[in-house]
Each structure stands twice: as structure tokens, then as C-alpha cells.
Amino acid sequence: MSEGLQRCFVLHRRPYSESSLILDVFSEEYGRVTLMSKGARSKRSNLKGALQPFTPLLLKWSGNGSMKTLRQAEPISLGLPLAGINLYSAMYVNELVGRVLMAEVAMPAFFHDYLHALTELAHNENPEPALRRFELALLSAMGYGVDFLHCAGTGEAIDPSMTYRYREQKGFIASVRRDNLTFMGDELIAISERRFITKEQLKAAKRFTRIALKPYLGGKPLKSRELFMPTIALSRARSIGK
């Protein structure tokens, strides 16, 4: 049972029976929680339009099992203004949280990282930097500790002009080979600072987070990624045509 109203976001919702909803929510104080909202789909329900992803909510629930019962819900504000590729990117963020985080593990600091990511997506045209910062915050919240600033082999500071190869659970070692697991030193420094100045640094961050998140996602593809691939292709086609 929650102690009072809790700040939450709906990650995913699905219909249940004729008039109810099952909600997967991410809360500030309780982490990821599954809720049953009885009667939320009925015509008389005042919650019908409120229990949506990307709308800041105050929720209260009861119950001790894996599925709680929603008792009270209040929208804090209107939903975040997300559209196009940024909407699909926010759906990707929600799917990652739902897939990777364990249920009912409090992560108040990461909740703020999540909120910051959605806010960035709502107010910036290019979603890529926000997505990379969010993925890195997620890895950090799960205890995925990687030192981007020191060579794992020697302990020396990363040289921006050198090439380093990533070794899972160990870090980065100097390398003369170039493949999917190697990164330039300046790219590693940019990832550590979560500040991406060049396209190459942003691409390197994406490549690293894909490698690091793969064990947590298993072989099951992300649905949100499949949804926004046609949108990305269309956007690229329009850019070429200009």
C-alpha cells in the first residue's frame, strides 16, 4: 500500500475486462508498480483521459500482492507535448524502464533522470542526446559501473587521441584494432561527461549503450523501436530530397 499520493507516470496500459485497466507505472518512491484501475474505461469514469503515458500523476493504491488496486488518481498537469519521432522516442524510454527495472525497487534519483529525459524530448527537436543520457543514467541506476576516464589495463587517464577496446565487466583497454567494440578516447570522455559535441561522439554513445543494454533485454526486440523505424526512414528520405 502506498503512503499517501505518489508522483508517478504510466509506462504502459492495457484493457482488462469490459471497463478496467491494468497499469504499469513508474513511481518516485516505490519504483515500478502494477496497478488495477477498476472502472477506468467506463463512460462515467473521470479517469478515462488522465491515466495516459507522459502525464504527470499523483496516485494512491492498496494491496500487498504483485498487482495493487488503484484508489485515487489526480493529474498534476497536462501531458507533455510529444509528437512524431520524439513521441516514439518517449515510448522507447517507457519500454526500457518496463523491460529492465525490477518491480517495486525504489529509485527516486533515477525517477528524476526519467522525468528529465521526457522533458528534454518534449522541448528539443533532436531526441538523440536525451536518449543517450537517459540510457547511461539507466545503466548507472542498475549498478553498471564503467570507468570511461581510465584505461583498465594500466590505470592511466584515457588519451583523447588513442583507440580503446571495451571488455565487458572490465572496462576499456588500449587497442590498435578497430571494430564495433573499439572507441576513440575523446568519445569515451564525451560519454563520461554525457556531453556530445560531434556526431561521432553521439554515435559512439549509442553504440556503447546498445552493447551494454543487450544482456538486460535478451533476444526479444523492442516494440517501440520497430514502430519508429518507418518514421526515421521517412525523415531521412525527406532530408535527402531537400
Swiss-Prot record:
GO terms for cellular component: bacterial nucleoid. Keywords: DNA damage, DNA recombination, DNA repair. Signal peptide: none annotated. GO terms for biological process: DNA recombination; double-strand break repair. SUPFAM superfamilies: ArfGap/RecO-like zinc finger, Nucleic acid-binding proteins. InterPro entries: ARFGAP/RecO, DNA_rep/recomb_RecO_N, NA-bd_OB-fold, RecO, RecO_C. PANTHER family: DNA REPAIR PROTEIN RECO. Belongs to the RecO family. Involved in DNA repair and RecF pathway recombination. NCBIfam families: reco (TIGR00613). This is DNA repair protein RecO. It comes from Vibrio atlanticus (strain LGP32) (Vibrio splendidus (strain Mel32)).
